[in-house]
A protein has these predicted regions:
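Left-handed beta-helix
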Residues: 76-84, 88-146, 157-160, 164, ...
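A solvent-exposed beta-alpha-beta segment
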Residues: 2-68
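Phosphate-bearing ligand-interacting subdomains
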Residues: 41-101, 105
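A general structural motif
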Residues: 5, 32, 64-66, 93, ...
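Short glycine-rich anion-binding loops that position phosphate/pyrophosphate groups of nucleotides
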Residues: 16, 74-78, 213
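Alpha-helical elements of the RecA-like P-loop NTPase motor core of helicases
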Residues: 18, 22, 80-83, 198, ...
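Glycine-rich hexapeptide-repeat left-handed beta-helix
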Residues: 150, 155-230
Length: 230
């Protein structure tokens, strides 16, 4: 286990926050010292023996000049909750930690933004660009020179071929695949096992099947959010 010489506050106290705590504790030099959630959602005082403090007051006990943070929220409301808390914490002056599991393969000239979480056994090829606030679960392939924009969420087993572009706040489900040079517009949901063989130009679509076809409901209807975002 690595020596813990940096302090981290996790934003969130749900299942993903618990998972993030395990990974940071086991595979990083960050010591998790507290969890924080918005006052309205606090239903207990501790998690793993650590305090859960109101997000609205986090800087009182954990000032941004001494502590970094990570927003451990999944794809709730089409990734908008994670995006909102990320922006609010940034406005408070916090800097963010990106976690990359030691088993991840990173090709040359890969660029990864802040507040990202990349689980084990991902293959990220040369010149891939990953934006801020992106969650990538285990065992995905991201092909050379592909771009994943801010606030996206990739489940496990996703295959993204080379030169693809994934728009902001999109969700890619388990075992979906994209042909090379595919462009996906923002706020898109790609369902489990879907095979995308052509560009998705209109934002807010939900796609399933092989080849992927659009469903009548939009992603905004599925998640109950507005198209313009936060």
């Amino acid at each position: 286990m690595k020596e813990k010489n940096k302090k981290l506050v996790i934003i969130g106290a749900g299942e993903f926050a618990e998972i993030a705590y395990e990974y940071f504790s086991g595979f990083s030099d960050y010591e998790v010292v507290a969890f924080t959630v918005e006052k309205a959602f606090i239903n207990k005082s501790e998690l793993f023996g650590l305090p859960i403090v109101p997000f609205e007051e986090i800087e009182k006990d954990y000032p941004p000049d001494k502590y970094k943070t990570f927003v451990a929220i999944t794809y709730t409301q089409l990734n908008r909750v994670r995006e909102r808390l990320y922006k609010q914490a940034k406005k408070k002056g916090y800097k963010f930690v990106t976690f990359i599991h030691p088993t991840v393969f990173l090709g040359r000239d890969v660029k990864i933004g802040e507040n990202c979480f990349i689980f084990e056994y991902n293959n990220i090829q040369r010149k891939v660009k990953i934006g801020n606030n992106v969650i990538i679960w285990a065992k995905n392939h991201i092909g050379h020179q592909s771009i994943i924009k801010d606030n996206c969420y990739l489940a496990s087993g996703v295959i993204i071929s080379g030169y693809c572009k994934i728009g902001e706040n999109s969700f890619l489900g388990v075992n979906c695949s994209l042909n090379d040079k595919i462009k996906i517009s923002k706020d898109t949901i790609i369902g489990n096992g879907a095979i995308v063989i052509k560009d998705i130009e209109e934002p807010g679509g939900v796609y399933v099947g092989n080849p992927a076809r659009r469903l009548p409901k939009s992603s905004y209807e599925v998640f109950g959010v507005k198209e313009e975002g936060i």
